[in-house]
Amino acid sequence: MQIELTDAAVTWFKNELELPENNKVLVFFVRYGGEFQLKQGFSPAFTVEPKEDVDIGYEQQYDDLNVVIAEKDLWYFEDDHIIVNVVDHEDEISYSKK
């Protein structure tokens, strides 16, 4: 399992979500529905949470941006390499599978 953020995505998260912030982490989680589906009926989403509120199952650092996935959501991301990027003309986050 790997979550790969492009440089553009790291910059987008820092600017849009005002990260890094003291003890806050970028959390990827599973949601019902959505366009990009690794497993049928579910898609990735993200939020910002205090690090102590997340039961971390996966953690990776990009510059000073701390990216985590909770233990309960690992089932969705396991066995996949996901690339998180920015769609330039829409200024939105996009996902693809490597």
Swiss-Prot record:
InterPro entries according to UniProt: HesB-like_dom_sf, PdhI-like
Entry similarity comment: Belongs to the HesB/IscA family.
Name the record gives this protein: Uncharacterized protein SAR1364
Organism: Staphylococcus aureus (strain MRSA252)
